[in-house]
UniProtKB/Swiss-Prot annotation:
This is Crossover junction endodeoxyribonuclease RuvC. One of its GO terms (cellular component) is cytoplasm. It catalyses: Endonucleolytic cleavage at a junction such as a reciprocal single-stranded crossover between two homologous DNA duplexes (Holliday junction). The lineage of its organism: Bacteria, Bacillati, Actinomycetota, Actinomycetes, Bifidobacteriales. The RuvA-RuvB-RuvC complex processes Holliday junction (HJ) DNA during genetic recombination and DNA repair. Endonuclease that resolves HJ intermediates. Cleaves cruciform DNA by making single-stranded nicks across the HJ at symmetrical positions within the homologous arms, yielding a 5'-phosphate and a 3'-hydroxyl group; requires a central core of homology in the junction. The consensus cleavage sequence is 5'-(A/T)TT(C/G)-3'. Cleavage occurs on the 3'-side of the TT dinucleotide at the point of strand exchange. Its cofactor is Mg(2+). Coiled coil: none annotated. Mg(2+) 1 binds at D7, D141. The keyword Transcription does not apply. It comes from Bifidobacterium longum (strain NCC 2705). InterPro entries: RNaseH-like_sf, RNaseH_sf, X-over_junc_endoDNase_Mg_BS, X-over_junc_endoDNase_RuvC. It holds the Pfam family RuvC.
Amino acid sequence: MIILGVDPGLTRCGVGVIEAGEHRRLSFIHVDVVRSSPDITQDLRLLAIYNGLSEKMDRFAPDAVSIERVFAQSNRNTVLGTAQAAGLAMLAAAQRNIPVALHTPTEAKLAITGNGQAQKIQVERMVTRILNLTKMPTPADAADALALAICHALRPAGALQGGEREQHLTAAQRQWAEAAQNSTRRRINHDRGM
C-alpha cells in the first residue's frame, strides 16, 4: 500500500510518500515540500499548493492520503491557511478517488514514538530510524508528512469513507484503478533499482 502523508501549510506543505508492505514493513519512497510565495495573492498561493499536491498524487498514485487534522490555534491567519491547504489535499484526493484519513499530531507522535507528547526532534529521529534514512528529512514539514504517512500505516483508524469508495466504482473503474496502481508500483520499483 502506498501512503501519501500531507503536513498542510500555505507557505510550506510537506509531502511524504511511503510504502507499507507485509508485516508492517515500511519503505521510503519520496519526500518534498510544496511551496507558495507569500508575495503573491492568496488565490494564486492556493493554486500553487493544489497543483503541487495534484502532481504528487498523479506521480505516486497512493492508495491512501493521510492529512494532519487542523486544530484552532491562537494565530487565526496561520490556522486559516493550514485549513485551506488541508482542504486542497482532500479535494485533490477525492478527485482521484483516493481515500483520505485525518490524524491529529498527538496520534502521529504516539504511533511514531509511543508518546503522544513527544518533542519534534524525537519524532524526526524515529521517522529517520523507521524508514532507514541516512539523515533526518528537512525541513520539519517534510518529516511531519512522513510521520503522518507512517501513522496511517500503523494506525489506519482515522480513515474517512475508507471502504465506501470501492463500492461506488464500476468494475471497469476498479480494473483501471488497479492497473494504474500496478503501473506506478512498477515505475517506482524501477526507479529504486529493484
